[in-house]
Amino acid sequence: MKKGFLLVTFLLFSIVFYAQHYTKEKIEIPFKLSPNGHIMIKASVNGVPGNFVFDTGAGMNLLTKDFADKIDNLEKTTHFYTGHRATGEAITSDLYQSEVLKIANFSIEDEQFAVYDIDFPLDGLISLTPLQHKAFTVNFEENKLVIESEESLRRRKENIKFEMPLEINNDRNVKVSVGTIVQLDSLELHVGLDSGAGFDVYRFNSRFMEALGIDSTQVESKYIPSSFKPEQGNQYYFAEVSRLSDLKVNAEQIDFRATFIDGLIYEGIMGINWIGEIITFDIPAKRILVN
């Protein structure tokens, strides 16, 4: 009897817990794609409108200093964060708190931002932190970012082609990123999923080249300085790889060009377009649904 009561209580708690993470109505956010496949959205911070890259690999929200200087009541906190670019450079930034971040009809209060003095064509990056408890869909067919309701997510689940595991990296709710497990030829790797990388970008740590039968002395390579810290840089190698897929081989790339990088802090990091045209990141359930 007691076991049955505990089971019912657990199930009810789980239902309530997950339901709280979905919006009452789905919210559709139009986006534009750059020629390289970057997702560009409009958003406002404390009522100041701007243009941003939606970047699942950014980790944290970023405002350019020029844009931040336009915003009233952007509060500088006592906190800071030291993050690392994929190529290893440490970047330390003070943290600022907004009153409200609004993206179409979706708004969230007290969102944190890093502010960086950088020459950037847009006003900054919107990361996964505003959506860290949501399910959202990147629809490349209709150029829409959809924040799912419980009902719209249910309908997506009824029509999925396949599902993939979603790995989540959350550091104090300041830096949030996602990834999955892939098969790269004979190797099983944990990779970051980075919409900010653009289309058809596949980067791996150079330590895997030997296991893949790639001779670093026989492929194209060059040293590239950091755009953030020009005194630092990495050696890049460019080679053909025969196959990349998810573990169940539902999505795959065959005979593609990949980049191998000395000092990459991940096993791999890549764009998301290889997965499919309509990709749902269900963060509460730690899964990717592909329609």
Locations of regions flagged by a protein language model:
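Bacterial Sec-dependent N-terminal signal peptides
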Residues: M1-K24
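Pepsin/retropepsin-fold aspartyl endopeptidases
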Residues: Y18-N291
